[in-house]
A protein has these predicted regions:
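Acetyl-CoA-dependent GNAT
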Residues: 1-39, 46-56, 85, 104-114
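Short glycine/proline-centered loop/turn elements that form peptide/ligand docking sites
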Residues: 46, 68-72, 89-94
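Residue-level recognition of the GNAT/N-acetyltransferase active site
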Residues: 33, 37, 66-68, 93
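A short coil/beta-turn micro-motif at the C-terminal edge
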Residues: 20-22, 67, 95
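Conserved active-site tyrosine of GNAT-family acetyltransferases
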Residues: 76, 81, 101
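Conserved catalytic-core motifs of GNAT/GCN5-like acyltransferases
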Residues: 62-64, 82-99
Length: 114
């Protein structure tokens, strides 16, 4: 499974892990330590994993995010993801819907160069 780790002064501050099958990829988890959020770590990790997946022939990437996680949803939108569905009661503790997002790799590459 492809992944990237972000570090600052020898401390892990974030990571992203994904998987790919044929021409589709899925981001399984992207996390950044609270004190390093809103500093570009998450967007850097997201761009890196999308570029890697694209280099492996992936043309579309999917992920799920909690409906209430506005910060993560904004990050994913910046990376080129768009809502394509909803999974009712997907998460537990608390029970909550997941928003299914999709990004086309060519669109991501174009927006990342701006």
């Amino acid at each position: 499974m492809p992944f990237f780790v972000a570090a600052a002064e020898r401390e892990i501050v974030g990571y992203v892990i994904a998987r790919a099958a044929a021409d589709e990829g899925e981001i399984l988890n992207l996390a950044v330590a609270p004190q390093f959020r809103r500093r570009g770590v998450g967007s850097g990790l997201g761009r890196a994993i999308l570029e890697l997946l694209g280099s492996r022939g992936v043309t579309a990437v999917y992920l799920e995010v909690r409906a209430s996680n506005a910060v993560a949803r904004a990050l994913y939108e910046q990376l080129g993801f768009r809502e394509v569905g909803r999974r009712a009661n997907y998460y537990r503790r608390p029970v909550e819907d997941a928003i299914l997002l999709r990004a086309a790799i060519p669109a991501v590459r174009a927006s990342a160069k701006l």
